[in-house]
């Protein structure tokens, strides 16, 4: 990776605004570089964290399927950081290592119907910026309208995050280097 355009903050040298934003992450262990970078813009970070928290922890999506979508959009956006970080989160959400690798191939292959639809919807959102009528109708057989809204916002959120991570050059955290994004 090239030198970051925006260097993450030094955890040992935080101003009051950054410390306030990062305190929950500090309490839970060392904050990841994404948070140390975004804390350089405290107003943005405060507001983004509310939305991010909804998408990752409070949405109506089942965690496993949420991670299918996040990993797929991370892969499609070629976001090394997103892919590495969510391989861990996806595994914690119940995805097997083989499934995580299969996400690279998209909705084709040996997925159950719901998994295939989640991946297909993610691909459609990436390519067309909307879910097709056919995919939407099929997903409604499994999920509520609120869940489909959360799916759209999850894919949008992680598209945005992938863009920021790549543009800012956020470096991989030390513990993520073994989980690098490798394209075919």
What do these predicted ranges mean?
Residues 1-63:
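Secretory/endomembrane lumenal or extracellular ectodomains immediately following the signal peptide
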Residues 181-184:
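Conserved small/polar residues in nucleotide/adenosyl-binding loops
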Residues 35-38, 48-55, 68-74, 103-104, ...:
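Short alpha-helical scaffolding segments that buttress acidic/His motifs in well-ordered protein cores
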Residues 91-101, 106-107, 111:
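Histidine/lysine/aspartate-rich catalytic loop segments that bind and position anionic ligands
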Residues 105, 113-152:
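Acidic/histidine-rich alpha-helical segments that form the ligand environment
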Residues 61, 65-68, 73-93, 97:
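Conserved alpha-helical segments that form or flank metal/cofactor-binding pockets of metalloenzymes
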Residues 145-172, 177:
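Preference for long, well-ordered alpha-helical segments
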């Amino acid at each position: 990776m090239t030198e970051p355009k925006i260097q993450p903050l030094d955890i040992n040298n935080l101003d009051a605004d950054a410390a306030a934003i990062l305190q929950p992450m500090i309490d839970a262990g060392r904050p990841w570089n994404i948070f140390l970078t975004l804390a350089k813009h405290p107003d943005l970070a405060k507001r983004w964290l509310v939305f991010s928290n909804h998408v990752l922890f409070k949405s109506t999506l089942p965690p496993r399927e949420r991670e299918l979508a996040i990993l797929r959009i991370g892969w499609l956006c070629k976001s090394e950081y997103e892919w590495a970080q969510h391989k861990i989160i996806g595994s914690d959400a119940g995805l097997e290592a083989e499934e995580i690798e299969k996400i690279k191939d998209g909705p084709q292959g040996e997925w159950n119907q719901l998994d295939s639809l989640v991946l297909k919807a993610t691909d459609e959102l990436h390519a067309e910026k909307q879910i097709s009528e056919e995919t939407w109708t099929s997903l409604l057989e499994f999920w509520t309208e609120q869940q489909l809204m959360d799916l759209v916002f999850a894919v949008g959120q992680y598209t945005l995050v992938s863009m920021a991570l790549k543009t800012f050059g956020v470096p991989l955290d030390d513990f993520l280097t073994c989980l690098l994004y490798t394209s075919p």
